[in-house]
A protein has these predicted regions:
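Metal-dependent nuclease catalytic cores that hydrolyze phosphodiester bonds in DNA/RNA
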Residues: 1-140, 247-248, 252
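Short acidic (Asp/Glu) and glycine-rich catalytic loops that position anionic groups and cofactors
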Residues: 33-35, 160-163, 204-209
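Short histidine-centered catalytic/ligand-binding loop motif
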Residues: 41-42, 85-92, 164-174, 216-218
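Hydrophobic/aromatic-lined pockets within catalytic cores
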Residues: 57-61, 158-161, 188, 235, ...
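Secondary-structure boundary elements
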Residues: 113-118, 147-153, 188-195
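Conserved catalytic cores of phosphodiester-cleaving nucleases, focusing on short active-site segments
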Residues: 124, 141-169
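Coil-to-beta-strand transition motifs
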Residues: 136-140, 147-151, 194, 205-208
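Metal-dependent nuclease catalytic regions and adjoining charged, substrate-binding loops involved
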Residues: 170, 174-177, 182-265
């Protein structure tokens, strides 16, 4: 079993490994090989806020988030940022720190989220690596949380709309179904029990409503097939060093079915 726990591998070290991860698969499945090949990993205000909420929920005992000055400008921020980076911690402005705390508190007030995140069996931010035996491609994954005995994978999502309809749209837009299928596939290659994948979704705006969702068995089967087909595309692109879009030179945009009645007039 190829497992490297977070204590043994930092997030930066994980991302430096050249194996294919879930973000790569999501990009290819939802956009193209060209988008994946040309993408640059970015860090931003929103990225830091999301990382802080993850750290507060999954590893609160490590106190990985630092409350910084009012703004990101000036000497005070620069000095604290250098110190935080050295310590492997996340520096936030005063407002963002308070926002992350509010989101964390709201999330933990959700009964299901609290039950999952306070489980003593929770393994947070562990890295897993495997080689797919059929495609011969190196894979990696770093799930937010894993309840090993229960066979449950947890994924924290900070979002604009945690309602059933809103999150359903987000699943389609951002490829969360492919992400879930990929995580489950790599974990199973590592002989890890995986029976379910649960998204813990917390809204960014007050009152930070939180909801938990799972994908249906049919949805996961469909996502698994799509994910495996995407891995084949990635492997072929790597072997041939060809990363195109597969888009036509001249495409035709057709009238959506829901607009047919309008066109009749």
């Amino acid at each position: 079993m190829t497992i490297i726990k977070s204590e043994d591998m930092s997030n930066e070290e994980y991302h430096a490994r050249r194996a294919v991860g879930s973000s790569s698969v999501k990009t290819v499945a939802s956009k193209s090989l060209a988008h994946w090949k040309g993408q640059v990993r970015k860090e931003s205000h929103a990225f830091d806020l999301g990382s802080a909420v993850h750290a507060m929920l999954l590893e609160p005992e490590k106190q990985l988030v630092i409350r910084g000055p009012e703004t990101r400008r000036g000497k005070a921020w620069t000095e604290l940022k250098d110190e935080a980076d050295t310590l492997g911690k996340i520096l936030l402005t005063e407002a963002d720190y308070d926002l992350a705390n509010s989101m964390t508190d709201a999330c933990m007030n959700n009964n299901m989220a609290n039950h999952l995140l306070t489980n003593p069996d929770l393994l947070a931010e562990a890295s897993f690596f495997a080689t797919d035996p059929d495609i011969d491609i190196e894979l990696k994954t770093r799930p937010d949380g894993l309840l090993r005995e229960a066979g449950i994978v947890l994924d924290i999502k900070t979002c604009q709309d945690a309602s059933p309809r809103g999150f359903e749209r987000a699943v389609r837009t951002f490829g969360y179904d492919v992400q879930a299928a990929f995580y489950m596939h790599v974990l199973r290659l590592n002989k890890v029990r995986v029976d379910n994948f649960i998204f813990v979704c917390c809204e960014k705006d007050s009152p930070h409503v939180t909801a938990c969702y799972e994908l249906s068995e049919m949805y996961l089967r469909h996502a698994h097939n799509r994910m495996m087909a995407t891995l084949v595309d990635i492997k072929q692109a790597q072997d041939n060093d060809e990363y195109g879009t597969n888009w036509p030179d001249l495409g035709t945009i057709h009238l959506p079915a829901w607009m047919d009645s309008e066109a009749a007039f």
